[in-house]
Amino acid sequence: MQWGHCGVKSASCSWMPSLSFLSVWLILSFSLPYCLGSPSQDGYWSFFSEWFAPRFSVRALPFTLPNYRRSYESLLPNCRPDVPQFAFKHPLGILWHMRVSHLIDEMVSRRIYQTMEHSGQAAWKYVVGEATLTKLSKLDIVTHFQHLAAVEADSCRFLSSRLVMLKNLAVGNVSLQYNTTLDRVELIFPTPGTRPKLTDFRQWLISVHASIFSSVASSVTLFIVLWLRIPALRYVFGFHWPTATHHSS
């Protein structure tokens, strides 16, 4: 919903709720690109769409980031073996952002109309006033949705940090399976011999240094050979060496 300017004195205050709602929109819009890549419909995060349903957001629960991480760890055993397929479904539900925005708009609009009904026509000229807008911006439901948006942005960063690993697993046709006996998630490779070979970091570093040294040494050797075999190359770089003169008798 939109509010107009409320005059010269309170022109700056008339945009306070809209800035509050704009921050929610920005958080939700910027968290979308990080969550576009996702597994298939019955994949790892299919339960997140139900877990982030609006019925949980309507209840103003004490939702903190440590509680969210503990909840995520408790939901980790629900992972089912599946081959990752990306860009098919939003891990938190593609309609979740629309639901949040509609709920914010609906709750604030309902509170405004309740104020109008109780205060009568005299409240219309104070609707865009500083006091009314300050009360609206300090509503518990607005603060709660802002907190939910921050939690969702954090969860999107948490999931997007693992998208590279899952994408690499998808290239190798690797699946995930939760082992109830060992209480951990295991990788399932298509064949026993396709397990990737891990290279030691020191060996990798030595090979990189050896490659750099060999390339530099080969280039220096080639330059010396050309310097000795092509005399004109010396004059290109400005070296005019004296040559031996033979005196004829």
Swiss-Prot record:
Topology with respect to the bilayer: Single-pass type I membrane protein
Glycosylation sites recorded in the entry for this protein: 173, 179
Keyword terms: Glycoprotein, Host endoplasmic reticulum, Host Golgi apparatus, Host membrane, Host-virus interaction, Membrane, Secreted, Signal, Transmembrane, Transmembrane helix, Viral attachment to host cell, Viral envelope protein, Virion, Virus entry into host cell
Virion surface topology ranges: 36-207
GO cellular component, one term: viral envelope
InterPro entries: Arteri_GP2a
Disulfide bridge positions per record: none
Transmembrane feature ranges: 208-228
Intravirion side: 229-249
One GO-annotated biological process of the protein: virion attachment to host cell
Chief place where the protein resides: virion
Stated name of the protein: Glycoprotein 2a
Naturally occurring in which organism (per UniProt): Porcine reproductive and respiratory syndrome virus (isolate Pig/United States/SD 01-08/2001)
Gene label: GP2a
